Amino acid sequence: MTGFPRISAARDSIVTASDPHPALGRTLSRIAFGSCAESSKPQPVWDAVLARKNDLFVFLGDNVYGDTRDPAVLAAKYAELAAQPGFARLRETTPVAAIWDDHDYGENDAGADYPMKEASRKVFLDFWREPAGSPRRQRDGVYASYLVGEPGRRVQLILPDLRYNRTPLTPMELNGADYDAWARARVAAGLPQPGPYVRNPDPKATMLGERQWQWLARQLEVPAELRLFASSVQVLADFTGWEAWANFARDQQRLFDLIRRKRASGVLFLSGDIHYAELSKLDVNVPYPLWDLTSSGLTEEWRVPTPNSNRASEVVADANFGFVDVNWRGDATRLAIGIVDAGGETRMSWEIPLASLRAPA
């Protein structure tokens, strides 16, 4: 995380250190987030982001489109992002935290078998100015957790790594047919376009890897009023064939069960990846009603949204970012969440009582 000089790295062995920033010690009340930023394209969305004067901005992955096994090429893509005027202003004025997804990991839909993952990890951590002594540099991946604020107003930011240890995806069987041609034909016929994968039935398949699962269990024991779980792919969307937690149904349920077992209140999922924005909700087989606010992309757009039976909103298919505003009022604290387009218009918004995100005693 850049911007906060000393933030508790929740249940880690050290405290992360960074350059001094005037936001130090402030309660987090205005948080923005986004994903999917093509560094070679204009990025006018930053004007709208900056106008909000956020306490924190969270990058959810595909922060650049590297798609390369050459670390020098990947670093050059980050240099393009750094040269974007809006991004540069963001970095100067607002604390930033980041996780990666496949395209800044290095290859489309890649997981644990990606051979250049260590090189990509170094490029990622260097660009986001991770301190040399950070626990993040010692882990099997780039996952991290931060705790900001005083008791009664604590925000925990959980950044899981959904690439470094993830089991390879299981391709759809098309009897030799080409997926791209098959998908184009469906779209031309006005039909939804399922993704190219099926659920992985292997009981040993994993999203996080066992070491990261144990780390996550410890994070959910840390006292916090609000937990922002920043997932690079959707957590609550039902299975569509595209990348999501639903590709690994056992791990998806394991996540919900872990939240229940740890009595971890205040979880709100933030996600990206899909090139449109939506809100998903799940209230079956979960410890309390769970929400997943998806914002995608900062530059990228997709006009054919996939069916999602857990969708609780319309779809915004224009460039966008998401926000979480917290009105801290003790037991009456409320979250205002929503989606803003590149022109600064709030396209969707909702209010959620923080007390509704409370695990049963």
State each model region's role.
Residues 3-361:
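Metal-dependent phosphoester/phosphodiester hydrolase catalytic core
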